[in-house]
């Protein structure tokens, strides 16, 4: 199964397989989202990258999409259908009743499907209260209690968003590369911004996980994901990093939702019209 996570920073493509009966996923490639690209342009690009990754049309029996960029959802879905002959299923609130996590109102009305996928993957893995930290365009924290209820979400500016904002919102601060410095005391402007933004985010993550545990009233497992989570891979005494968490969640969800309950326009193999 082809898994697609359409986000604000990247469109991530992965493929699902099984290992000893367990769901496993492999990221294939990432694209920069571009609303100016046509369906045909996306189709040619996705086809070429799938071929390069060794994934032919015969391997794409089904496709499952999460998207938080509505303007791209149909374009990407139709591009995949054009290549594979399979109309992707687009994950949405229609599937929430069939998940191992529960989503109460008003969270249900606004939570992104990527965060739901994260919560599903984490809860299936830990089977206990957990906090998922996603380091993407936004820095998000999703808290799930021991019964599988999503208690809430916190959203802060992401790392790249923060450095871009400092650059565009000031007269002299440069656009600095993202890196984790050893010290919080910068010796030049680049180091100072990296210390404040990247190492500062590290402290925010630790503090927010601790506060989530306090508000949930229990110790929680924690996991870090997102395209920029790699910046913290050298940290000790830090939650594990799982860059494939969102794709893993989509794979679990795709297996859990009965085909008979899929919206007619998104049943795999339908015309999609």
From Swiss-Prot:
* Record: active site: 114 (proton acceptor)
Can you tell me which residues bind ATP? 5-12, 137
Query: Entry's InterPro entries?
Result: ATPase_NBD, Type_III_PanK
Q: Which GO terms describe its cellular component?
A: cytoplasm
Q: Any keyword Transmembrane? A: no
Q: Where on this chain does K(+) bind?
A: 134
Primary localisation category: cytoplasm
What's in the keyword line of the UniProt record? ATP-binding, Coenzyme A biosynthesis, Cytoplasm, Kinase, Metal-binding, Nucleotide-binding, Potassium, Transferase
Which residues are recorded as binding substrate?
112-115, 189
Which catalytic reaction applies to this protein?
Answer: (R)-pantothenate + ATP = (R)-4'-phosphopantothenate + ADP + H(+)
Question: So which domain of life are we looking at?
Answer: Bacteria
* Pfam families in alphabetical order: Pan_kinase
> So, what pathway does this thing act in?
Cofactor biosynthesis; coenzyme A biosynthesis; CoA from (R)-pantothenate: step 1/5
The record's remark on the cofactor is: A monovalent cation. Ammonium or potassium.
Query: MF terms per GO, please?
Result: ATP binding; metal ion binding; pantothenate kinase activity
Q: What is its EC number?
A: 2.7.1.33
Cofactor(s) of this protein: NH4(+); K(+)
Q: Where in the cell is it found?
A: Cytoplasm
The answer to keyword Transcription applying to this record is no
Q: Which GO terms describe its biological process?
A: coenzyme A biosynthetic process
Ranges that cross the membrane? none
Q: Which family does it belong to?
A: Belongs to the type III pantothenate kinase family.
NCBIfam families membership = baf
Instruction: State its role.
Output: Catalyzes the phosphorylation of pantothenate (Pan), the first step in CoA biosynthesis.
How is this protein organized at the quaternary level?
Homodimer.
By what name is this protein known?
Answer: Type III pantothenate kinase
Print the organism lineage: Bacteria, Pseudomonadati, Spirochaetota, Spirochaetia, Spirochaetales
């Amino acid at each position: 199964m082809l898994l697609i996570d359409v986000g604000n920073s990247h469109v991530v493509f992965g493929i699902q397989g099984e290992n000893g009966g367990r769901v496993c996923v492999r990221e294939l490639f990432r694209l920069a989202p571009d609303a100016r690209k046509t369906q045909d342009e996306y189709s040619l690009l996705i086809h070429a990258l799938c071929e390069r990754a060794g994934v032919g049309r015969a391997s794409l029996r089904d496709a499952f999409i999460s998207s938080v960029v509505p303007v791209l959802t149909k374009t990407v879905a139709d591009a995949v259908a054009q290549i594979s002959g399979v109309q992707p299923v687009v994950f949405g609130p229609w599937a929430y009743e069939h998940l191992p996590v529960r989503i109460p109102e008003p969270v249900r009305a606004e939570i992104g499907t990527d965060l739901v996928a994260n919560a599903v993957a984490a809860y299936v893995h830990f089977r206990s209260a957990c906090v998922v930290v996603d380091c993407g365009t936004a820095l998000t924290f999703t808290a799930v209690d021991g019964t599988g209820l999503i208690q809430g979400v916190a959203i802060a500016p992401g790392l790249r968003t923060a450095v871009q904002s400092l650059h565009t919102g000031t007269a002299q601060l440069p656009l600095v590369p993202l890196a984790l410095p050893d010290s919080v005391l910068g010796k030049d402007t680049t180091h100072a911004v990296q210390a404040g933004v990247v190492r500062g985010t590290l402290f925010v993550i630790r503090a927010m996980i601790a506060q989530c545990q306090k508000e949930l009233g229990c110790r929680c497992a924690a996991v870090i994901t997102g395209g920029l989570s790699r910046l913290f891979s050298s940290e000790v005494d830090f939650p594990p990093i799982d860059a494939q968490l969102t794709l893993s969640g989509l794979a679990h969800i795709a297996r859990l939702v009965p085909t008979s309950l899929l919206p007619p326009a998104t049943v795999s193999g339908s015309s999609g019209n």
